[in-house]
């Protein structure tokens, strides 16, 4: 829920899928794919940075492993 809210706060048209959590002794990996509209021109590195920063503000132990995908619809 937290990751989806962060992504939707950036752009309501974005969504996530294939979400997994892997908890370790020093941090928690949040692994997921972000689906963005096919015509969206945001730079993937910038989007990853924005999402990561917002999640680390919520919990500094969160580490993100994400892929950005463009929808085909």
What are these model-derived regions, one by one?
Residues 1-73:
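Peripheral (non-transmembrane) domains and long loops of multi-pass membrane proteins
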């Amino acid at each position: 829920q937290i990751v989806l809210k962060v992504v939707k706060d950036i752009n309501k048209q974005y969504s996530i899928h294939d979400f997994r959590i892997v908890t370790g002794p020093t941090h928690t990996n949040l692994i997921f794919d972000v689906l963005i509209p096919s015509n969206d021109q945001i730079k993937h590195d910038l989007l990853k940075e924005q999402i990561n920063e917002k999640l680390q503000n919520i919990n500094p132990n969160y580490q993100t492993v994400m892929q950005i995908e463009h929808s085909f619809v």
